Structures are given as C-alpha cells and as structure tokens.
C-alpha cells in the first residue's frame, strides 16, 4: 500500500500538476479537477496506510505483551504509537491532510520508528533465543 501511495503522490500527482501548469487557460479547469481527483486518491491511500500500520503495530504490541519474551514496555510502546496512528487514518479519511491529522500522525509515526528500533535492538540482544531455551542452544 505504501508503494501505491508513493506512486500516486510522487509520480501521478506531480504529472497532473505539471500538466496543469503547462496547459493553456482553456484546459486548466479540467486539469485542475483531474489533479484534485488524484489528490483524493492519495488521501484515501494515506488513510488506509495509517490504519493498516497502526493496526499492525497495535497487534504486535498485544502479542509482545502476551509473549513476554521482551520487556513489557516494548509492547506498550507499540500500542502507544499504533493506536494514534489508526486514529490519524480516520482523521485523514475525513479531513484530508489537515493540521489535526498531521498533529496526530507525525508524533505517532515517530513513536513507531522508535519502537521498531527498540524492538530490533531487543531481538538482536536476545539472539533469537526464547527465555526457556538453555544458553547453549541459543542462536547468535
């Protein structure tokens, strides 16, 4: 989904805006509406991407809390970033890229980035071992 979002935002929308900028006055209105439609597709994809990312992180957080392989706060951090990311997806769907949507989404995504780095560090340190495995059998 993120790839589709980047394709719409970085390629299709730029093409539409460039076409609008270069068009003669008689064609500008139609191209404006076409560019606006592409922008609405971008908003829809961004909304779904936020919902999906937030849901995934939240479910990982729950799994980390249940599993107990890693510190409890790692699972909590996933949920602290995941839930507002889902909320941002709902806000983006209803208000577009509004100030409110960005005020929710940007800090939540920053938390998820921190969470991913922390979880990666925890997994690296544990070497993939389960707490109930003998040290001699742990993978390095």
Task: Locate predicted features.
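Hydrophobic, aromatic-enriched alpha-helical segments typical of multi-pass transmembrane helices
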Residues: 1-140
